[in-house]
């Protein structure tokens, strides 16, 4: 299976990454099948070879999570709703509302007692 993943290069503690297509069993920094782009997390610079990426995606290459987000930002993939994140946010909102209601009811009870 072909994966689209990041290949690290650069100085120590100043990493940059190349977006590459490689076999899923190969090493992270091993020889890739094709270089498809560049990503620098320090400057947020991203360069994508859109034509080559489209070809690899139509051939069935699977992007890793980080590469998927870069492709979504680049407009090559539709944004995927991650259910665990959406569910987590919904649960947090419900908890906030429940806490606010309980505080209101406690303050109402204290006022009624006095």
Curated annotation (Swiss-Prot):
BP-aspect Gene Ontology terms: translation
Position of the signal peptide: none
Keyword list, A-Z: Ribonucleoprotein, Ribosomal protein
GO CC, one annotated term: cytoplasm
Domain of life: Bacteria
Transmembrane segments: none
Pfam families per UniProt: Ribosomal_S16
Classification via InterPro entries: Ribosomal_bS16, Ribosomal_bS16_CS, Ribosomal_bS16_dom_sf
GO MF: structural constituent of ribosome
Keyword Ribosomal protein in annotation: yes
Family in the record: Belongs to the bacterial ribosomal protein bS16 family.
Protein name as catalogued: Small ribosomal subunit protein bS16
Organism annotation: Prochlorococcus marinus (strain MIT 9515)
Gene name of the record: rpsP
